Structure formats: C-alpha cells, structure tokens
Amino acid sequence: MRLILLGPPGAGKGTQAGLLTKKHGIPQLSTGDMLRAAVAQQSEIGKRAKAVMDAGQLVSDEIVNQIVSERIDAPDCANGFILDGYPRTVPQAQALGTMLAGKGLKLDAVIELKVDENALVKRMESRVAETIAKGGQVRSDDNPEAFRKRLVEYREKTSPLSSYYAGTGELRVINGMAPVEEVTAEIERILVPA
C-alpha cells in the first residue's frame, strides 16, 4: 500500500496515518523526520541538507526528492508507506511519480481529507484548552493567528495538489469532519474495495 494523505493542518492526517501504520505495518514517512535522519547519519545528501538548513534556507526540492527516494528504498517500505508532508507542491508530485515509475512502483491512492477551515480553528482551540487543562505543553504554533497563517500557506502552496492528482485519477476525497472511526473506515474502503 503506497499512499499520500492530503489535507490542511489539523485535518487529522497524522491521526489517520498512525492508525493505518498500526493496522497495516507500513511506515509513515514524514519529510521532517527523513531530513533529520539524513542529517544525523551525515550521509552525503544529509550534509547538503544540513548546510542549507544551517544557512536558514528551505531545503530544495532536489534534496528532498533524493531523501524521499532513498527512504522509499529502505526494507521497511517493501510493503508500502504513507507519505506525510510530501509532496507539498505539484513539481514535487511530478518528481515523485517519475521516481516511483523508475522503481517500478505506483501510488495506490491519494486521499484528501476535506474539512471546514472554521471548524478546524475551533478544533485547534479545543485541543489547546484540553492540553492546558491536562497541564501539558502547547505548541508555539497552536494559536488562532499562527494556525490561520498555516491554513493560508496550505491553500496557496499545497492545495493545487488536489487538482493535479484529480487529473491523474488517483485522488479520493473523504469528509475529514466525520468522526475518526468513520474516516478510517472510508479510507479502508478505498484501499481495500469490496
């Protein structure tokens, strides 16, 4: 199972990826985690990424694509993977398609969790209140203003992926506002048709 989960921040991608990972025994591949691992391993590509990050710049698509390609080759990805936070742009999606084809692989599905942005802000505010009530640490970007900025960035940079994958026939859209169990069941129906 090779899968991409799309949706704005707070849509539940991480929750669904965790459930699918547990059920199917496939890894969730996060670009942030992959970049940190490459830097820690001091691989050639990791050293290049570190130099860019140390300069306070965004890591180029070329470097990110190479790190993703190397990670997909790892033994734990033999039965599939869930991509989290990649691709973020249409050029990255095109590079991923070319990369997978070169490995004799293809995506099984691109699943977009459709959500109402105003409801997402309320969901985030509830999560913050719950975390504070439990005495937990709140993420610095978990405030309405920062969250809305992340939503705008998603809309501008990442949402064009929906049109791209709709054009390839790989996109499946799910109501991300449904309860977690219903979203999971719908994803399973897409991945394992009756």
Curated annotation (Swiss-Prot):
Keywords: ATP-binding, Cytoplasm, Kinase, Nucleotide biosynthesis, Nucleotide-binding, Transferase. It comes from the Bacteria. The keyword NADP does not apply. Pfam families: ADK (PF00406). Its EC number is 2.7.4.3. Pathway: Purine metabolism; AMP biosynthesis via salvage pathway; AMP from ADP: step 1/1. One of its GO terms (molecular function) is adenylate kinase activity. AMP binds at residues 31, 36, 57-59, 85-88, 92, 139, 150. GO terms for cellular component: cytoplasm. GO terms for biological process: AMP salvage. It is found in: Cytoplasm. Disulfide bonds: none annotated. Residues 30-59 are annotated as: NMP. ATP binds at residues 10-15, 127, 178. Residues 126-142 are annotated as: LID. It catalyses: AMP + ATP = 2 ADP. InterPro entries: Adenyl_kin_sub, Adenylat/UMP-CMP_kin, Adenylat_kinase_CS, P-loop_NTPase. Monomer. Belongs to the adenylate kinase family. Consists of three domains, a large central CORE domain and two small peripheral domains, NMPbind and LID, which undergo movements during catalysis. The LID domain closes over the site of phosphoryl transfer upon ATP binding. Assembling and dissambling the active center during each catalytic cycle provides an effective means to prevent ATP hydrolysis. Catalyzes the reversible transfer of the terminal phosphate group between ATP and AMP. Plays an important role in cellular energy homeostasis and in adenine nucleotide metabolism. This is Adenylate kinase. The lineage of its organism: Bacteria, Pseudomonadati, Pseudomonadota, Alphaproteobacteria, Hyphomicrobiales.
